[in-house]
C-alpha cells in the first residue's frame, strides 16, 4: 500500500521544508502543492547547486515525479512562466510533469498593485506581506469574483470578466489609494500570451490523487509558510491568507482527510519569524544576532532579515493540536553549535500571572506575554554535516530529546546542513 504524507511548517515558515520535500521525493510518484502562492521560497541545495522554487512543487527536480498544483494555490501566470523558464534553461522537463487544477485562482497585476497600495497606506502598522498579490487574490476567491485558471479557455469571456473586475480595482487604486491604474489591454495581452501553455497543463487533480491512492502510489503534500501563519489559527492579523495547516490538504487539493497517513512537522532547532506579529522568544541581543548570522536568516524570496529566538515549545504544542503531527524533522541543528547554553520556552506567563501551555490564537492575546525557559548546557563541537546521530555531542542529543519530551512528538529526521545528504532519517515517514 502506498502512503500519503504531508510536510508542513510547524512554526512561522522558513523551517527548511523544501530540502526535506526534495529528500523524500525519491520515494514518491506525486508531489502536491495545496495552498499559498509564489510568496514562499523553498531553497534546495543539491550537490552544491542552489535552486529556489516559489510556486512549482519541489519534486520537479526528480525526473520520475509528477508535480500537481491544487485548487488551494493562487497562481500568478507571470511567476509560473518565469519559474518554468529558469528550470527549463537547466534542462529540467517541466511541462510534461507539471499539472494544474483549473480551479486555481489567478494572481494578476491589479492584485499586486492593491497589495502594495494597502501596505503603503498602513505605514508602520503594515502586515508585512511579500507584496505579490496573494491576499487580494484570495479575497477575490472568497468574494466569488476572481478569475481562475479555467477562465483562460475562453478569451472573450475572460476579457469581459477582466474588464469588470479591473474597473472595480482601478476605482479603489486611483480614488482611495491615489495610486496608478492598471492597464486593461496590457493585462489581457500578457495573460493571453501564455494562456495556451497554462491550459495545456490543466488536469483533474482530485481524480488523479484518488486514482494514485487506489493504485498504491506514494503521495507527498508540500505545505508552504508555517502553521502559526494560518489565516484561521495563526497570530491574526499577522498571518498569511491561506490555511497552512494539514486541513488545507483536503480543501486545497481535494484529498479526503481520512486518507492521510503521516504528518511531518518541520521545525528549526530555534525559531524565526519574518515581518510583524507576536514572537515571544525573540532575541534582541548578541545571541539573536549570532543565530541570524550563522543561520543565514534572510528570506529566500524577499531577502528580508528574519527575527530570531529560542525554541518555543508552547507555540509548537498548538501546531501539534492543529495538524495531528506524527513526527518532527528538526533542521538547522548545527546553527546552535558553539553556544554556552541553549534554551527552550516551555510555558508562557501572562500579565495577570496565569501560566499557558498552549499559544494564544489572536495577536492581541500575546501582549505582555513572557517566556518561561528551561536552560540546558550547549555544545562546542561542530555538528555541521553529521549523518550519524551517535556522532552528535551528548548535550546536543539531550537538547533534541528534551524537545521530544516537552512536545510529546518524536524527532524522526534531523538536518545538519542545507544539502540533501546532510540528513539523518531516524524513522522514514513512508515506512512508519
From Swiss-Prot:
Annotated positions binding Mg(2+): 14, 41
Example of a GO MF term: adenylosuccinate synthase activity
Catalysed reactions, as listed in the record: IMP + L-aspartate + GTP = N(6)-(1,2-dicarboxyethyl)-AMP + GDP + phosphate + 2 H(+)
Cofactor: Mg(2+)
PROSITE patterns: ADENYLOSUCCIN_SYN_1, ADENYLOSUCCIN_SYN_2
Ranges annotated as spanning the membrane: none
Binding site for substrate: 300-306
Keywords carried by this UniProt record: Cytoplasm, GTP-binding, Ligase, Magnesium, Metal-binding, Nucleotide-binding, Purine biosynthesis
Active-site positions on this chain: 14, 42
Principal localisation: cytoplasm
UniProt subcellular location: Cytoplasm
GO cellular component annotations of the record: cytoplasm
Entry keyword Nucleotide-binding: yes
Pfam families in the cross-refs: Adenylsucc_synt
Binding site for IMP: 14-17, 39-42, 130, 144, 225, 240, 304
InterPro entries (UniProt xref): Adenylosuccin_syn_GTP-bd, Adenylosuccin_syn_Lys_AS, Adenylosuccinate_synth_dom1, Adenylosuccinate_synth_dom2, Adenylosuccinate_synth_dom3, Adenylosuccinate_synthetase, P-loop_NTPase
Annotated coiled-coil segments of the chain: none
EC number, as in UniProt: 6.3.4.4
Function: Plays an important role in the de novo pathway of purine nucleotide biosynthesis. Catalyzes the first committed step in the biosynthesis of AMP from IMP.
Similarity comment: Belongs to the adenylosuccinate synthetase family.
Subunit structure: Homodimer.
Protein's recorded name: Adenylosuccinate synthetase
Lineage: Bacteria, Pseudomonadati, Pseudomonadota, Gammaproteobacteria, Pasteurellales
Gene name of the record: purA
Amino acid at each position: 500500500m502506498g502512503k500519503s504524507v504531508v510536510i508542513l511548517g510547524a512554526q512561522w515558515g522558513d523551517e527548511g521544508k523544501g530540502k526535506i520535500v526534495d529528500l523524500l521525493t525519491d520515494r514518491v510518484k506525486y508531489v502536491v502543492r495545496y495552498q499559498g502562492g509564489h510568496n514562499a521560497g523553498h531553497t534546495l541545495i543539491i550537490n552544491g547547486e542552489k535552486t529556489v522554487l516559489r510556486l512549482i512543487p519541489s519534486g520537479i527536480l526528480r525526473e520520475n515525479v509528477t508535480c500537481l498544483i491544487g485548487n488551494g494555490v493562487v497562481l500568478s501566470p507571470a511567476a509560473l512562466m518565469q519559474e518554468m523558464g529558469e528550470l527549463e534553461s537547466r534542462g529540467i522537463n517541466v511541462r510534461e510533469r507539471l499539472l494544474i487544477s483549473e480551479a486555481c485562482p489567478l494572481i494578476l497585476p491589479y492584485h499586486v498593485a492593491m497589495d502594495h497600495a494597502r501596505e503603503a497606506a498602513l505605514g508602520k502598522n503594515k502586515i508585512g506581506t511579500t507584496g505579490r498579490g496573494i491576499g487580494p487574490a484570495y479575497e477575490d476567491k472568497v468574494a466569488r469574483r476572481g478569475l481562475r485558471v479555467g477562465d483562460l479557455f475562453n478569451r472573450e469571456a475572460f476579457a469581459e470578466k477582466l474588464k469588470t473586475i479591473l474597473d472595480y480595482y482601478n476605482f479603489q487604486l486611483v480614488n482611495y489609494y491615489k495610486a496608478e491604474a492598471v492597464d486593461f489591454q496590457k493585462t489581457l495581452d500578457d495573460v493571453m500570451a501564455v494562456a495556451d501553455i497554462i491550459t495545456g497543463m490543466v488536469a483533474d487533480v482530485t481524480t488523479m490523487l484518488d486514482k494514485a491512492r487506489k493504485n498504491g502510489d506514494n503521495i507527498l503534500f508540500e505545505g508552504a509558510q508555517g502553521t502559526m501563519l494560518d489565516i484561521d489559527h495563526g497570530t491574526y492579523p499577522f498571518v498569511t491568507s491561506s490555511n497552512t495547516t494539514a486541513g488545507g490538504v483536503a480543501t486545497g487539493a481535494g484529498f479526503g482527510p481520512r486518507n492521510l497517513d503521516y504528518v511531518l512537522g518541520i521545525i528549526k532547532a530555534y525559531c524565526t519569524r519574518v515581518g510583524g506579529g507576536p514572537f515571544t522568544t525573540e532575541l534582541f541581543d548578541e545571541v539573536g544576532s549570532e543565530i541570524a548570522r550563522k543561520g543565514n536568516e534572510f528570506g529566500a524570496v524577499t531577502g528580508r532579515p528574519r527575527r530570531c529566538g529560542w525554541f518555543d515549545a508552547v507555540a509548537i504544542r498548538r501546531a501539534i493540536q492543529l495538524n495531528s503531527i506524527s513526527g518532527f524533522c528538526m533542521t538547522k541543528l548545527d546553527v546552535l553549535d558553539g553556544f554556552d547554553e541553549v534554551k527552550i520556552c516551555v510555558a508562557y506567563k501572562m500579565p495577570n500571572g496565569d501560566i499557558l501551555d498552549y499559544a494564544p490564537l489572536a495577536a492581541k492575546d500575546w501582549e505582555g506575554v513572557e517566556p518561561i525557559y528551561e536552560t540546558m548546557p550547549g555544545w562546542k563541537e561542530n555538528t555541521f554535516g553529521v549523518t550519524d546521530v551517535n556522532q552528535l555531542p551528548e548535550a546536543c542529543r539531550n537538547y533534541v530529546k528534551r524537545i521530544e519530551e516537552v512536545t510529546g512528538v518524536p524527532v524522526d529526521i534531523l538536518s545538519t546542513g542545507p544539502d540533501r545528504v546532510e540528513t539523518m532519517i531516524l524513522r522514514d515517514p513512508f515506512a512508519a
